[in-house]
């Protein structure tokens, strides 16, 4: 299996992010997504470390990961794995669940990340084939089709409840303060001692309560913020070297390595495919 990846934004659903990739040796570092991650495994076997357990997703399976929940991914077999992913917004899936249940509800909750639903897998694979075309000739038709498939995914496999069965533990009041501090100073360099002084908590306790609330330790959340900013700023013509420094990375090499570990493609590839 040849390692290759293409990431782009489709015009449907207000720039839906799409990733088609094949990997053998590449592994995704532990990270989170702002939106839902809905993927299909088209070849090989993927391993996903999620909610404290390692799950395997073979060819023909669907993988759904909740927004904000930390996870890492890698090839479960030597031959690697190929997958297609879309990242529908939380609001979109929530609206679909409201339509399905006809009552106000929380964010859809998927109890298991790996789903076996062959008919839905085949339908999603067909939708991805249409998404991969250089130009989408009938955006309305494709958007309607994808909405139908996502509604089917939610109705068959999400928990229909007003409250998610997986609620985070009590959130220490300083967690939001540290999150806000990192969000407004993401380009700066910090040590855990810096954040400890900022919060008034010991480094160990801060790391524990932050991970429990956010799904990532503070340093990984800082990387998440930088990657999110990079995705936005790659739409501009700023040089990658300057962008790396502006975002707080040591240099372009550090930026490139980190971006690929989180997104699956290099910053240069991501920028080039934004224009497709």
Residue ranges and their predicted role:
Residues 2-106, 133-136:
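N-terminal regulatory/effector-sensing and dimerization cores
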Residues 44-45, 117, 273:
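Extended, non-catalytic scaffold segments that flank or surround catalytic motifs
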Residues 51, 76, 96-100, 156, ...:
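Residue-level signal for well-ordered alpha-helical positions
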Residues 105-121, 131-199, 212-220, 224:
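Short, Lys/Arg-enriched, Trp-marked, Pro/Gly-tolerant hinge/linker segments that flank
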Residues 124-128:
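Short, Lys/Arg-enriched alpha-helical recognition elements, typified by the DNA-recognition helix
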Residues 176, 180-184, 188-193, 201, ...:
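Terminal helix-turn-helix DNA-binding modules in bacterial transcription factors
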């Amino acid at each position: 299996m040849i390692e290759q990846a293409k990431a782009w934004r489709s015009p449907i659903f207000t720039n839906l992010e799409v990733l088609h990739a094949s990997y053998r040796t590449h592994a995704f570092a532990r990270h989170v997504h702002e939106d839902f991650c809905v993927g299909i495994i088209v070849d090989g076997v993927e391993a996903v470390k999620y909610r404290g357990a390692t799950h395997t997703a073979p060819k023909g399976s669907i993988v759904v990961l909740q927004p904000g929940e930390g996870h890492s991914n890698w090839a479960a077999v030597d031959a690697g794995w190929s997958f297609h992913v879309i990242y529908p917004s939380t609001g979109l899936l929530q609206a679909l669940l409201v339509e399905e249940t006809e009552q106000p509800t929380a964010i859809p909750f998927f109890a298991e990340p790996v789903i076996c639903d062959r008919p839905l897998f085949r339908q999603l694979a067909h939708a991805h084939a249409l998404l991969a075309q250089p130009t989408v000739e009938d955006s309305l038709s494709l958007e309607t089709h994808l909405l139908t498939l996502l509604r089917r995914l939610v109705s068959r496999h999400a928990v229909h409840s007003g409250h998610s069965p997986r609620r985070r533990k009590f959130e220490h009041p300083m967690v939001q303060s540290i999150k806000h501090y990192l969000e407004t100073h993401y380009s700066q360099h910090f040590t855990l001692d810096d954040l400890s002084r900022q919060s008034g908590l010991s480094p160990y306790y801060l790391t524990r309560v932050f991970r429990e609330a956010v799904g990532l330790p503070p340093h990984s959340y800082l990387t998440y913020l930088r990657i999110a900013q990079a995705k936005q700023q790659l739409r501009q013509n700023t040089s990658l070297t300057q962008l790396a420094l502006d975002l707080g990375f040591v240099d372009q090499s550090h930026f490139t390595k980190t971006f690929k570990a989180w997104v699956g493609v290099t910053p240069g590839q991501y920028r080039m495919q934004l224009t497709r």
